[in-house]
Amino acid sequence: MTKPIRNVAVLGATGSIGAAALDVLARHPRQFHVSLLAAGQRVDALLALCHTYRPDHAVIGDATLYTTLRDGLNAAGLATKAYAGEAALAELVASTTCDTVVAAIVGAAGLHSTLAAARAGKRLLLANKESLVLAGMLLMREASISGAEIIPIDSEHNAIFQCLRSRTTDGVHRITLTASGGPFRGHNRTMLAKITPTQAMAHPTWSMGPKISVDSATLMNKGLEVIEAHHLFGLPSEQIDVLVHPQSLVHSLVEFIDGSTLAQLSLPDMRTTLAVGLSWPERIGSGVPGLDLMKHNRLDFERPDTETFSCLRLARDAMQTGGTAPAVLNAANEIAVSAFLQGRIGFLTIPALIEHALTTLPRYEADTLETLLTVDTETRRITHAALTHFPLPLPL
């Protein structure tokens, strides 16, 4: 019996995860149809993707670029319908336009569309970690009510998902997320004070966008992933461990109460996790070769240095505080990373700004989206205001 074609929406289509998803989808035209493509501001790149993949719908987040998108589609003779803005995207992902959503919009900007997909009961391939960090309780509740199928696309959570063959943690003693350690593993604080944005974006094993690359360099990426794992798998902080594994071949480990430990290994390529999410519980080709253990003949593990890289500690603290603290952490980090990439602050000022926000703002119960968005806005305001009180980056 032939299975129906799955209609897939790729949100964040012009980013690195979007490109990986489209690569996998293009390999299986009889199984998948790209029904919707969405991007934030890169309208020319979105138009090029529309020309290649011929989606039914295209959405540009920046409403001022709607005319450019619409006219570009018309000039190319494409039948793709143009839309703009957050509300239009949320409405489309909740409609019959798609049954599968790749949520890869970076930052809090992806929250509304991710929640809309969860409420509508879609298969949600979740690469937008901020949705879980900012509103994890709400997202998981909506998915539970609607029957949405959440499959994490982060390599670490996808590895746990594969080891468990689901998100059920019966019999699990603990899970261990691995971290590459970023480009500055082994650096001390004196060395980190001189780091430039260009250096921070040079990740040793993964190809990622600027914001995620900096998060990896500060270990905030791993901190956010600890919070994600808490929501995805329902485990407390003490059952979520982190180890630095510079080869980035073992993506996570699951230790069971009987003494067994399962690990998932693969080359560091997001196409593997995307293929898992698109086809689960079956398997499809991703374009990623298998792992040659004779070529990679050693696997190293070490504890993360949370004194030097304090973002991981701050993330754990925020998770244990609960309520709106993770939302504060996330918003302050976004502002701090943006300022660092603009050369306005030094590398070590990123955790300092985050800690300032966490100690300044009160904790509330994270029981409504309105509360979370209000806290998000207020955190951004006070973090912006605090930028002038922190030292500028050191001259090279």
Curated annotation (Swiss-Prot):
Its EC number is 1.1.1.267. The keyword 4Fe-4S does not apply. It comes from the Bacteria. Gene3D superfamilies: 1.10.1740.10, NAD(P)-binding Rossmann-like Domain. InterPro entries: DXP_reductoisomerase, DXP_reductoisomerase_C, DXP_reductoisomerase_N, DXPR_C, DXPR_C_sf, NAD(P)-bd_dom_sf. Pathway: Isoprenoid biosynthesis; isopentenyl diphosphate biosynthesis via DXP pathway; isopentenyl diphosphate from 1-deoxy-D-xylulose 5-phosphate: step 1/6. Pfam families: DXP_redisom_C (PF08436), DXP_reductoisom (PF02670), DXPR_C (PF13288). Mn(2+) binds at residues 154, 156, 225. NADPH binds at residues 14-17, 40, 128, 130, 209. SUPFAM superfamilies: 1-deoxy-D-xylulose-5-phosphate reductoisomerase, C-terminal domain (SSF69055), Glyceraldehyde-3-phosphate dehydrogenase-like, C-terminal domain (SSF55347), NAD(P)-binding Rossmann-fold domains (SSF51735). It catalyses: 2-C-methyl-D-erythritol 4-phosphate + NADP(+) = 1-deoxy-D-xylulose 5-phosphate + NADPH + H(+). One of its GO terms (molecular function) is manganese ion binding. GO terms for biological process: isopentenyl diphosphate biosynthetic process, methylerythritol 4-phosphate pathway involved in terpenoid biosynthetic process. 1-deoxy-D-xylulose 5-phosphate binds at residues 129, 155-156, 180, 203, 216, 221-222, 225. Keywords: Isoprene biosynthesis, Manganese, Metal-binding, NADP, Oxidoreductase. Its cofactor is Mg(2+); Mn(2+). Catalyzes the NADPH-dependent rearrangement and reduction of 1-deoxy-D-xylulose-5-phosphate (DXP) to 2-C-methyl-D-erythritol 4-phosphate (MEP). Belongs to the DXR family. This is 1-deoxy-D-xylulose 5-phosphate reductoisomerase. It comes from Xylella fastidiosa (strain 9a5c).
